[in-house]
Amino acid sequence: MPTSGTTIELIDDQFPKDDSASSGIVDEVDLTEANILATGLNKKAPRIVNGFGSLMGSKEMVSVEFDKKGNEKKSNLDRLLEKDNQEKEEAKTKIHISEQPWTLNNWHQHLNWLNMVLVCGMPMIGWYFALSGKVPLHLNVFLFSVFYYAVGGVSITAGYHRLWSHRSYSAHWPLRLFYAIFGCASVEGSAKWWGHSHRIHHRYTDTLRDPYDARRGLWYSHMGWMLLKPNPKYKARADITDMTDDWTIRFQHRHYILLMLLTAFVIPTLICGYFFNDYMGGLIYAGFIRVFVIQQATFCINSLAHYIGTQPFDDRRTPRDNWITAIVTFGEGYHNFHHEFPTDYRNAIKWYQYDPTKVIIYLTSLVGLAYDLKKFSQNAIEEALIQQEQKKINKKKAKINWGPVLTDLPMWDKQTFLAKSKENKGLVIISGIVHDVSGYISEHPGGETLIKTALGKDATKAFSGGVYRHSNAAQNVLADMRVAVIKESKNSAIRMASKRGEIYETGKFF
C-alpha cells in the first residue's frame, strides 16, 4: 500500500458516516485502494507514443502511463508515486505559472501555444480569407462542408464520447476504425486523450480536478482550460485501460498528427478541388472554418451546457439540459440527463428532443455494426425526475408558513383542556390538536353560530364531514391556530399532520 505522502485523489472530503462500519461489525471499503482501481494503476498499461501525444491538451493533463525507461519491474503505482514525489519537491522551490499573476514579462508563459495555434491561429487564417472575399463560398463547397461537419461531429459524439468514453454500446472494428479516423477531422485530440480527460470530468465534476471546471467561469470552461497551462497540483487520473486495449485507439493515437492533417485539411481540399474545382474553398471552408465551428460547438458542451438550461434530474452539480446546444452537437446538449445516466447510449429520451447521435447508434445496430446498446430503466429515470421535483417542492415549502410544528406545542390532557377553555373561550379540539379560533369566529364561512357551538368541545367529527367536510384550504387555515396537542389523542394529531405532508420520526414524537 502507498506510504504517507501519496497523492491518490479522493473525490470528496465529506463522507457519510455509517454506524455499522464505524462499529467494526462491517469492514469499510479502503478508499486508497478503491481510488487506485479507479485510476487503473493496478494494471499494466504500455505507453502509446506519438509525435504530438498531448495535442489539444498538455503534458500535465495527459500523463496517463509512464515511460518504460529505468526499472522495468516498477508498477504503474510505483512510477506514479515516484513522479508525484518529484513534483512535490519541485513545487517547494518553484511556483507554477498558473499560480503566478499575469505580467508583461510572463504572459506568454501562461499560454499553451500549441493549442493557441490549433484553436485560435488556424481559424483566424480561415476567417481572414473568407471575410476578405479572397476565397468566395460556393454552394457545392458549402454543402460538402456541412456534410463533412456531420461526419467529423458524429465521429466525436458517437465514437469518442458514447462509444469509448462511456462504453454505452459496443461496435465492431469497421465502425470503430471509421470513428477513429474521422474523429481526427474535428481536431479535438486523439480518442485516448479525449476519453481520458472526459472520464476525469465525470469523476470530478465541478471540482478543482475537473479539467473544464464550470465553477471557474464561462470562458474558462469553454476555451480557457485548453489555452492556459493547467496547474499540475490538480492533475487527476482515470482508468482508460479498456481504451488502450482497443487496437483502433492505439493506431489512431500513434498516427494522430498525420491522420489529423489528412482528414481535417488534405481530404476536404482534394475533394472540393477534384469535384468542384475549388481547392482553396475546400481548404478554407471545409477545412479551417469547419474545424472552428465543430470545435466551438463541442466547447459549448463544457460551457453553455453547464450554465444554460434546465435540471430535471438533479441540481447538485452544474450540468443542464439545453436544446440549443443539442442542435449544433448532434444531441449532446441534454447534459443533465447525461451526467445522471452516463452509460445510456441516448442523451435525449423524449420523442421531440433532438438527438441524431442516438438514432445513428441505433441504425448501426440494425445493420450489425453496433451492439449491446445500454439504457437505464425507465423506472430509474422516473425516480430521478420525481426526486428532483420533490426537491423543488421542498424548497418552495420551506418558504411558506405551515403553522406551528406539533413537536413544538405543549402537551395537554383533556382535563387541562377543559380548564384552559374556561379562561379562553375560543379553544376547540380537532383531530387531537387544540386550536384557538377566537380571532376567526367572525370570519367563519359557515357563520358564527355554528362555530360557537364547537367552542370548548371536540369538533373532529363535525369538521370532518359530520356537519361539513372541510376543504384542504380550511385545514391549512386551521393549522395556523394550533396551540397544543391532546395527550390522549396524539396519534390522531400525527395522522392529521401527515395528511398535510408533515413528517415526524417514529419514536421521537414528544
From Swiss-Prot:
Gene3D superfamilies, per the entry: Cytochrome b5-like heme/steroid binding domain
Binding-site list for Fe cation 1: 161, 166, 198, 202, 338
Any one GO BP annotation for this protein: unsaturated fatty acid biosynthetic process
Gene: OLE1
Protein name: Acyl-CoA desaturase 1
Catalytic activities: octadecanoyl-CoA + 2 Fe(II)-[cytochrome b5] + O2 + 2 H(+) = (9Z)-octadecenoyl-CoA + 2 Fe(III)-[cytochrome b5] + 2 H2O; hexadecanoyl-CoA + 2 Fe(II)-[cytochrome b5] + O2 + 2 H(+) = (9Z)-hexadecenoyl-CoA + 2 Fe(III)-[cytochrome b5] + 2 H2O
Annotated positions binding heme: 444, 470
Domain of life: Eukaryota
Motif (Histidine box-2): 198-202
